[in-house]
Amino acid sequence: GCHGKTTTTAMLAHVLNSIVGANYLIGDGTGYANKDNEYFILESCEYKRHFLEYHPYYSIITNIDLDHVDYYKDIDDVIDAYREFANNTENLVIACGDDQYTRFLDLTKPVFYYGITEDNDIIAKEIEYSENGIHFEVEAEGNYYGTYDLPFYGKHMLLDALACISICYYERM
């Protein structure tokens, strides 16, 4: 996505590393590798279509926005780049269904949408914001999938966490 990549990558690295062990390379330069780990989490960027070099097993698209205006001519050019990236995914695309552009991708790959609106595959419900962070329940494909507490604030942090929860759900963790 254009925003939230580093946060989502760091969250996913933390979660998977605590469950099964994971290698990762985050956009801020943080990385870790262990030859025994099965998973590798990589933050990639849409700038100059650099992300088209990758063919991930899963891809997460947090959002699409007109960014890098020195390179992309308009939002349709950005959407075309994301479409090509997503179609390079080997297994499943996980995308924020609440984003105004992700549903325009018209992909050949299966897509699993996350968000807070009812038309997503995985949904945050009963959301409560407090001085301690965010408390919410998750419904995945119509079934209760757990209650979560995040020590973070804001809707975007909630959506980034839902992207990570979506990977865990799909991997049956």
Q: Model-found features: residue ranges?
A:
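Phosphate-binding loop of NTP-binding sites
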Residues: 1-110, 162, 166-169
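Adenine nucleotide phosphate-binding catalytic loops in nucleotide-utilizing enzymes
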Residues: 72-79, 91, 109-173
